[in-house]
């Protein structure tokens, strides 16, 4: 069994010789209602899922599976279609006002979005799409209807789940609504296949949503190994970013929201400097990312927290950056810090490791898969700032630790290439198509 594809139940029996001749779909309709793959990760609702969709679609296209991505238009200036890469088309769907709609308000626009998807399909002959792959629960509801209308299988990826998030909320975070829980439960029942990032996420689908284990496939996300690599090293990256060569640099990179817990990093730095004030002159704490959500989600809230903690002089807030510059931030850091309350996988953890930087993370969700505790980084139980401060102190006392662990981290990340992930996803597609056809034939003949 592939390192990337695991089934909680038994594998589907092999298809007939005729089915094996069509192992992959020719064309897939991907749905991403609430965030466009063209948006900058780290801003608003754009994050790891955006990277996931872009990379997966491009690698599927390279493996002769065309992908059309449907997403909601957020400005009237957008063309109806954009070619993201050869074989990958982004289709913008008008659904509600272009600006001012929060993600929480989008369920009211799902009817309009579905109408736009159907309009785009209407110009094609039946069979134009072989499969629907929806991302996040909002897209899952559109995918459910589209797959039924087109007579094709539905593959769905949750990315995050309401019940899991609600069980691990930060103190100042807002619970996911009951309507989302109901919606996710309906999608789990309707989908032909569910893709989970890790075995733990697959288990959560079964425990929390009563998913059929035989429908769940585990496919680890990948990392762009051409972009995220050690390259010319930490010193060169620090020189490009204007960072001191001898500094301890714990980096936070991602959306600024309670779920990601950037405040835990700031509180940990405050604890460290209270205990060891001599480190103040040689620590820099970059926070790279934009606002998302509410409460401490806004950078101003974090800036005020840094001031209250007495560490404003060592914290540097930076807006979201493109993937190439993000790779440089990873290379420059002593350690990437991810104190998240919930992560289905944690793409930035693999990206940082691929760039040669160890990770200090909360032991939640998929992070124990992404990070090898004690070898490529450190995992902390819970969110006590003092626990993170102790590890940061170890990095301060062991100057060769970033390089030593970073080398192991880069080697570890090599096993997470997107080509392998895309090939595994194509296997899931093939299994879904096989079972869907078999079910339809059985239903037709009684």
Swiss-Prot record:
Keywords: Glycosyltransferase, Magnesium, Metal-binding, Transferase
List of residues binding 1D-myo-inositol 3-phosphate: 34, 45-50, 103, 136, 160, 180
InterPro entries found in the cross-reference section: Glyco_trans_1, Glyco_trans_4-like_N, Mycothiol_biosynthesis_MshA
Region (Disordered): 1-21
Highest taxon, organism lineage: Bacteria
Molecular-function annotations in GO: acetylglucosaminyltransferase activity; D-inositol-3-phosphate glycosyltransferase activity; magnesium ion binding
Pfam families, per the entry: Glyco_trans_4_4 (PF13579), Glycos_transf_1 (PF00534)
Stated role: Catalyzes the transfer of a N-acetyl-glucosamine moiety to 1D-myo-inositol 3-phosphate to produce 1D-myo-inositol 2-acetamido-2-deoxy-glucopyranoside 3-phosphate in the mycothiol biosynthesis pathway.
Subunit comment: Homodimer.
Record protein name field: D-inositol 3-phosphate glycosyltransferase
